């Protein structure tokens, strides 16, 4: 059970602070059932009510500083999602987001950066679906790493790229050819990935 003041990841809502643990005085709600009242960190006035024993939506603690640093070191080895069928790919994105696992968010980001670069080289824009999942994955990953590392979220992409580039040489993605370490380069169209 979490305590008031804890920061947790709550499903696709992202990081929330537990502001209260209470029963709800509402019709149709058992009087003795405990609920977390959560405040999403990205919404000053937002509130989420969820049963303490909710098993339908993933709830977990924010990763530690050590876990965040380890994840960043492992980013070059995390493979993207290479699914040709649009509907199947979107379903996989949905599954990855729902898992609330940072490594799965990295997989989405790496995949979508490469797709974006490939599409730009062909004179095409990123699709609306890709853009939506890219924003969700980046938002969730960067906000969690920001809290874990005590670094402003706005500087997280550069921080990740710098950390990886300090320790890694360019790596090969087993499925698509050369991929520069870090996830920032591909976003800006500065990598050498061939589509």
Predicted regions located by residue number:
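Absolute protein N-terminus
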Residues: 1-2
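Conserved hydrophobic positions within beta-strands
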Residues: 16-18
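Charge/polar-rich, low-complexity and marginally structured segments
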Residues: 52-195
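Short, solvent-exposed secondary-structure boundary/capping segments
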Residues: 25-34
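Loop/turn positions that initiate beta-strands
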Residues: 5-6, 11
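A short macromolecule-binding patch
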Residues: 37-52
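Broad gene-expression machinery/nucleic-acid interaction feature
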Residues: 13, 33-35, 47
């Amino acid at each position: 059970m979490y305590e008031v003041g804890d920061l947790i990841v709550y499903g696709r809502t992202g990081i929330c602070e537990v502001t209260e643990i209470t029963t709800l005085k509402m019709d149709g709600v058992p009087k003795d059932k405990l609920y977390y009242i959560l405040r999403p960190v990205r919404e000053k006035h937002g509130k989420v009510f969820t049963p303490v024993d909710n098993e339908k939506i993933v709830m977990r603690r924010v990763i530690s500083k050590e876990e965040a640093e380890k994840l960043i070191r492992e980013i070059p080895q995390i493979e993207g999602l290479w699914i040709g069928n649009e509907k199947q790919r979107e379903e996989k994105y949905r599954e990855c987001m729902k898992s609330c696992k940072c490594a799965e968010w990295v997989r989405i980001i790496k995949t979508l950066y490469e797709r974006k670069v490939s599409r730009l080289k062909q004179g095409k824009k990123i699709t609306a679906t890709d853009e939506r999942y890219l924003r969700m994955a980046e938002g969730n990953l960067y906000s969690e790493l920001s809290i874990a590392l005590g670094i402003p979220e706005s500087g997280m992409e550069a921080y990740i790229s710098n950390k990886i580039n300090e320790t890694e040489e360019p790596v090969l993605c087993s499925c698509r050819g050369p991929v520069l370490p870090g996830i920032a380069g591909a976003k800006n169209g500065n990598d050498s990935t061939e589509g």
